[in-house]
């Protein structure tokens, strides 16, 4: 299938691990036609229609003789193999849906409800074990058993409560209490040293600035200069001694998502293990350099939780964190060195980094359609088709496919212009 680079497939996944498609989320024919019409008006939405699911639907529609128009027969619509492209297949899918009768819609709905497949959450089980297919947290265990599903590049988790998600990531990692206590003790120790380092650096900076000012004004005498120079040197020696006290913070790689040790621990299915080995899409892992870890550990105004998460390859974008921390996170995000970024919804409009997967948190259920589209746009910004996905923790995806009559953003903009 030929594919234009800007026409991607980014499947939407619900909280149970199933793909979201227009023909699988409707209740009647009028609802279906409204959704199709909206998608035809806003063709950008086609990027969220999964090609594999489209193929299954088209095959079903032809098998059940649901093509009610001659121009929509396969031979008429696709005149040659060269005519088959990703965008044309998606357009074809919408046109078939648009011409279905009420009886056909009912038949289609019943068939796909009975034959729904899970995209994530049910292949990582031991052979011959019984699985309960009512899991409402499929794909949520991003630091343990579901990490392997996050492939090709970094993931963004958009939420109103980054700290809550951060704590969940640590909790689910199953780091032994003794190990966790030791790590937090070291991080706390380094933070205390960091505060002292910060004060010393400020003292050195102030003295050097004062020396330069006196020098420019001609007020500094030779003896005074020497004294101030000695004081600066003494402070620098104290700074060096303090810095040498900083302890190295290391975490066993089995607690770092998608390292070999981690995958060996959490992938229990031998069939899945072999499938991953053969797949061109490999589980993505962080590549955090020691210098970045050291820089974060030295920051006095960063919560221990976020220092611990960085070691795991997880960063945070939020207005609540120190600017110095945020700058390091931006550098790591730009170079795609982080496994996961937990971002507050305030960062939806200002995050231009490349992500292959995204999560939309439960606490964003009231997000507007426009803001949702902006949020989803964070994923799949690469110029190539990779293995992408957007995973919803609430049914917010329904808002994506429905025409929104009163856009809050447009109303606010109109008010702004009227008031000027």
Feature locations, PLM:
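Conserved helicase ATPase motor motifs in RecA-like P-loop NTPase domains
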Residues: 1-7, 157
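Conserved C-terminal RecA-like helicase domain
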Residues: 14-343, 355, 364-388, 392-396, ...
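A short acidic, often aromatic-flanked loop/helix-cap motif at beta-alpha or helix-coil junctions
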Residues: 5-8, 322-324, 398-399
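Long, hydrophobic alpha-helical segments
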Residues: 401-420
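The feature captures the ABC ATPase H-loop/switch
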Residues: 346-347
